[in-house]
Curated annotation (Swiss-Prot):
Signal peptide: none annotated. This is Succinate--CoA ligase [ADP-forming] subunit alpha-2, mitochondrial. Expressed in roots, stems, flowers, leaves and fruits. CoA binds at residues 58-61, 84, 137-139. Keywords: Ligase, Mitochondrion, Nucleotide-binding, Transit peptide, Tricarboxylic acid cycle. It is found in: Mitochondrion. Heterodimer of an alpha and a beta subunit. One of its GO terms (molecular function) is nucleotide binding. It catalyses: succinate + ATP + CoA = succinyl-CoA + ADP + phosphate. GO terms for cellular component: mitochondrion; succinate-CoA ligase complex (ADP-forming). PANTHER family: SUCCINATE--COA LIGASE [ADP-FORMING] SUBUNIT ALPHA-2, MITOCHONDRIAL, SUCCINYL-COA LIGASE SUBUNIT ALPHA.
Length: 337
């Protein structure tokens, strides 16, 4: 079955190539049209107008988290499970393909709860259907599959992928796509972006406790090949008028935090940024939790990341327990609280 999934990914990669005959002839790229004026695009990827389908809706995880999303108030409009099209689940229509679901429900986002061997193919299917946003929660997707997905993402401009191996994205009070506990979030002023799911929840709880709340929270995931990075989110947070402060939670491995520091410095933003970097005592060459959390070749150390962030004017916390109070202190120092 894994080989079948690999072949499907390869076929979809060909279809996603804009120069291929399949792409130019496919009706999927022209069938979704707005009648009347469409709502304005969300400031940070999602808002109350986001219409979401669930890929893998009839599975255990898909069922549970779709129920949670509906209860939170997310506009869940349908689901996709091959060979179960035409049925209903949780009161929502189920379709065989993402393309069918998009036509019938006018969905513009998808959340993927599909087992690792088939998750990349599910992402590619959503890309072929030209959804605006795909959020992949699945952990353990083979890296060679994600390399193909990453290459396909670079060949198109319509679809944004958040994840994989991430908690998802939430705009408190409006839209929850993912596995995060909704009740700890509160509409507010802080944009949160993180490579760690549990540390995201910690930052959310603390910013809620000090009365600042959150504008949008994005878990970008800890895998080496993900769809959305710190820079993508920071650009949105800097431009978003609702976001008055930013929390960035990074970890060892890669150069994503250094890239974020460069953007913050170049942007000249006056919005306060507070960061925490996990893995300060991690030994080189040993993976720490996430697949991407590894110091190799002398690069990706916590010390390097902390130095780069401080040089960009970011306030760096030594403990994750101090994220909320640190942000509140910075707000008070700048007369924002």
């Amino acid at each position: 079955m894994a080989r079948q999934a690999t072949r499907l990914i390869s076929n979809l990669s060909t279809k996603l190539n804009p120069s291929s005959p399949t792409m130019s002839a496919s009706p999927l790229w022209h069938q979704y049209r707005y009648f009347g004026s469409p709502p304005p695009p969300p400031a940070v990827f999602v808002d109350k107008n986001t219409r979401v389908i669930c890929q893998g809706i009839t599975g255990k995880n898909g069922t549970f988290h779709t129920e949670q999303a509906i209860e939170y108030g997310t506009k869940m409009v349908g689901g996709v499970t091959p060979k179960k099209g035409g049925t209903e689940h949780l009161g929502l229509p189920v379709f065989n393909t993402v393309a069918e679901a998009k036509v019938e429900t006018k969905a513009n986002a998808s959340v993927v709860y599909v087992p690792p061997p088939f998750a990349a193919a599910a992402i590619m299917e959503a890309m072929e259907a030209e959804l605006d946003l795909v959020v992949c929660i699945t952990e353990g997707i083979p890296q060679h599959d994600m390399v193909r997905v990453k290459a396909a993402l670079k060949k198109q401009l319509r679809t944004r992928l958040i994840g994989p191996n991430c908690p998802g994205i939430i705009k408190p009070g409006e839209c929850k796509i993912g596995i995060m506990p909704g009740y700890i979030h509160k509409p507010g002023r802080i944009g949160i972006v993180s490579r760690s799911g549990t540390l995201t929840y910690e930052a959310v709880f603390q910013t809620t406790a000090v009365g600042l709340g959150q504008s949008t929270c994005v878990g970008i995931g800890g895998d080496p090949f993900n769809g959305t990075n710190f820079v993508d989110c920071l650009e949105r947070f800097i431009a978003d008028p609702q976001t008055e402060g930013i929390v960035l939670i990074g970890e060892i491995g890669g150069t994503a935090e250094e890239d974020a520091a460069a953007l913050i410095k170049e942007s000249g933003t006056q919005k306060p940024v507070v960061a925490f970097i996990a893995g300060l005592t991690a030994p080189p060459g040993r993976r720490m939790g996430h697949a991407g959390a590894i110091v190799s070749g002398g690069k990706g150390t916590a010390q390097d990341k902390i130095k780069a962030l401080k040089e960009a004017g970011v306030t760096v916390c030594e403990s994750p327990a101090k994220i909320g109070v640190t942000m509140l202190d910075v707000f008070k120092q700048r007369g924002l609280a």
